[in-house]
């Protein structure tokens, strides 16, 4: 495993390769619309198929990651991503583009699942997930700034994703194989029951709707900026890059705040504010209003997302809920482009924004309730320590940090487990001899005198 004070760069890189397709969704869907004989709704459906394939990989692998290890699935996922997205970027035949996008989505979803599982098992998972969000946001911002100057070809965003997968491949050699157990699962059986059977499904369903609302707007943001707000292609790329840069600041702010606000307030209040940002962006008719809505929205989105990742990871130190909730989020993300296209076609962009904002206000309540339920009574800092002497209460208090092998801040103490000893106790005193030297052939007994 990686050294405690060393950033797990292979996981960060794998996280980046897996999460890049959703970040590039607006330009991917927009270029499919303009560069291929597809309608806006059909282009959104291709984007949804890509992300649905990614979510499917997460659901299929969620319960198998500990047995498969990280190295082999990561390499397979990166290979599929490179081949699928690469092929889709090099052809203009619509069936081949769709097939390549679906194959690439399966690969990026596999990479995302491996990264989520291993990050949840890290001693400091918040640090790893924060670095991953920072890296993918920076890379996506660079793509948004660069791609408009390279032409109008539909395959440029897809090629960027394929090349990222290729660049990450050499780092997979540092990932553990199937024989290496995760730190959080050390000492636990492979058949331990899934905890959080009430909170987990509620959180997964709410996060699915949360992601659906976010990505319904994100999938049509490019068209809103071009057709309703009056931006050019290059100016739109700058707005997206600045918005993702603001998201970097949001992630850093979340890391700095850590446990000070708990999880309930960032998740609940953050979602309410995001609802307002979505309504503002969808109704924008000027470049200034559109840019303000996009930047504010993208500043808050990764903040709330980091707390949701941590909330899911805290439900199970083996990372199973982190993967399942992440896959539910991917399902919402997958349905986003098609949902946004259909809603905007039926109700217009402002009407779509109001519907999505209302959905976010509805799901804010159950997500906040799960965060409050997971919080509970705080532990005294330093009362329990992890290996290495770090106070567990302080480690678990960090935003997005699952409890691992010790209770999380606010969680009840773990029960004491009775351990069965194979060797039975000696039943009679006659089995003992008196202290002192014994003759070699003497039988044990109570001794003379």
Q: Where in the sequence are the language-model features?
A:
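A late C-terminal transmembrane helix in Major Facilitator Superfamily
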Residues: 19, 315-357
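Short amphipathic helix-loop junctions that connect adjacent transmembrane helices
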Residues: 26-42, 219-235, 310
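Helix-to-loop junctions at the C-terminal end of transmembrane segments
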Residues: 56-72, 120, 249-263, 344
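Structural signature of the two symmetry-related core transmembrane helices
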Residues: 72-86, 265-280, 354-357
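Cytoplasmic helix-loop-helix junction between adjacent transmembrane helices
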Residues: 94, 100-135
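Intracellular juxtamembrane helix-capping segments at the cytosolic ends
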Residues: 109-123, 302-317
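Helix-loop-helix hairpin linking two adjacent transmembrane segments in secondary transporters
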Residues: 122-126, 130-177
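C-terminal transmembrane helical hairpin of 12-TM major facilitator-type secondary transporters
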Residues: 261-308
């Amino acid at each position: 495993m990686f050294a405690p004070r060393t950033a797990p760069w292979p996981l960060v890189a794998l996280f980046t390769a897996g999460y890049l397709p959703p970040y590039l969704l607006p330009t991917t869907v927009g270029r499919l619309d303009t560069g291929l004989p597809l309608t806006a709704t059909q282009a959104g459906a291709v984007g949804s198929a890509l992300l649905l394939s990614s979510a499917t990989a997460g659901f299929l692998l969620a319960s198998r990651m500990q047995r498969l290890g990280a190295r082999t699935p990561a390499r397979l996922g990166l290979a599929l991503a490179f081949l699928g997205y690469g092929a889709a970027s090099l052809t203009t035949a619509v069936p081949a583009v769709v097939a390549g996008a679906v194959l690439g989505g399966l690969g990026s979803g596999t990479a995302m699942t491996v990264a989520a599982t291993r990050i949840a098992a890290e001693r400091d998972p918040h640090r790893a997930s924060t670095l991953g969000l920072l890296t993918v946001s920076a890379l996506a911002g660079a793509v948004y700034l660069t791609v408009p100057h390279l032409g109008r070809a539909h395959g440029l965003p897809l090629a960027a994703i394929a090349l990222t997968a290729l660049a990450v491949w050499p780092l997979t050699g540092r990932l553990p194989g199937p024989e290496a157990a995760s730190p959080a699962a050390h000492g636990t059986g492979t058949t331990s029951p899934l905890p959080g059977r009430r909170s987990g499904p509620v959180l997964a369903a709410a996060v699915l709707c949360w992601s659906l609302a976010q990505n319904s707007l994100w999938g049509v943001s490019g068209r809103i900026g071009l057709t309703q707000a009056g931006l050019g292609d290059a100016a739109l790329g700058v707005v997206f890059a600045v918005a993702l840069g603001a998201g970097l600041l949001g992630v850093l702010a979340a890391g700095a705040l850590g446990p000070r606000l708990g999880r309930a307030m960032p998740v609940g209040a953050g979602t309410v504010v995001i609802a307002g940002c979505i309504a503002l962006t969808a109704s924008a008719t000027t470049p200034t209003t559109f840019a303000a809505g996009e930047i504010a929205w993208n500043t808050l989105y990764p903040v709330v997302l980091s707390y949701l990742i941590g909330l899911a990871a805290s439900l199970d130190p083996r990372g199973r809920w982190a993967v399942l909730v992440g896959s539910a989020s991917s399902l919402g993300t997958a349905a986003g482009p098609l949902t946004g296209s259909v809603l905007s076609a039926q109700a217009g962009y402002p009407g779509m924004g109001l519907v999505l904002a209302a959905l976010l206000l509805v799901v804010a309540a159950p997500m906040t309730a799960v965060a409050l339920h997971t919080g509970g009574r705080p532990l005294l800092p330093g009362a329990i320590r992890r290996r290495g002497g770090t106070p567990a209460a302080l480690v678990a208090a960090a935003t997005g940090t699952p409890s691992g092998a010790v209770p999380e801040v606010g969680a009840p103490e773990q029960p004491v487990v009775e351990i069965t000893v194979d060797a039975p106790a000696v039943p009679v005193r006659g089995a003992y001899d008196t202290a002192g030297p014994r003759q070699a052939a003497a039988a044990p007994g109570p001794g003379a005198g």
